[in-house]
Amino acid sequence: MTKGKRTFQPNNRRRARVHGFRLRMRTRAGRSIVSSRRRKGRRTLSA
C-alpha cells in the first residue's frame, strides 16, 4: 500500500496570510490572541 505525498508543503506567503500579524490585528478575537501571547511573554506573537 502506498503512503501518498506529505500534506505540509511550506509556503511563507500563505503562512503569513493565514496566520500572520496583520491578519490577527483585523479581528477582535485575533487582537485578544496577540495580547494574551504578549501577557504570557511569548517570543513570537504570530507567524
Curated annotation (Swiss-Prot):
Molecular functions per Gene Ontology: structural constituent of ribosome
GO biological process: translation
Origin superkingdom: Bacteria
Keywords: Ribonucleoprotein, Ribosomal protein
CC terms in the record's Gene Ontology section: ribonucleoprotein complex; ribosome
Keyword Lyase: no
NCBIfam families documented for this protein: rpmH_bact (TIGR01030)
Family membership: Belongs to the bacterial ribosomal protein bL34 family.
Name under which the protein is recorded: Large ribosomal subunit protein bL34
Species, as recorded: Mycobacterium tuberculosis (strain ATCC 25177 / H37Ra)
UniProt lineage: Bacteria, Bacillati, Actinomycetota, Actinomycetes, Mycobacteriales
Gene that produces this protein: rpmH
